Amino acid sequence: AEKGNGAYLNQRRIHVSEISNLWQSYVFYCEGGEKDRLRTGSILSKVYPEVIDLRKLGSAGLETAWVAAGKGEAYFTTRIEPWDVAPGVLLVQEAGGEVTDFVGNPWKLETSDLLFSNGGVHATMLNLLW
C-alpha cells in the first residue's frame, strides 16, 4: 500500500468487503495482554452473538491484511503499540476501510484501542465496543 495509491496483493488491487450487516461479518480481535482479558471478554460477549464468527489469528499485521483484502469485516484490539498497527492502518485505509479508536476518532500514534473495518459495519461495531 502507498498513501493515495491504493492497496495491492501480488500486483492486484485489493478492497475491503462490501458487507454492511454485522450478522454477515467475520470479526478478528486481539487483547492487549493479561490486564485486558476481562475487558476484552466483556466486549466479546457483546460482539459474538451479533456476528458469524470471531477469529483470533495472533498477528495484527495478518488481521489487518485480511480486513483490507475483504476476508473479514472488522478487527479490534486493545492496548496495542503503534509499531504493531501502523502498516495495517495504511493498508486498510487504502483498501477503502476505516480505522478509529473505540469512540470513532481517527487513529493517532498514541491510540491504543483500535477498530479497523470495511466501513459498512464500523458504526455498529463502535456501539458494541462501549
Annotate each PLM feature.
Residues 2-8:
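DPxDG-like acidic metal-binding loop motif
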Residues 14-130:
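An extended, acidic
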Residues 1-2, 109:
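Generic beta-strand structural signal
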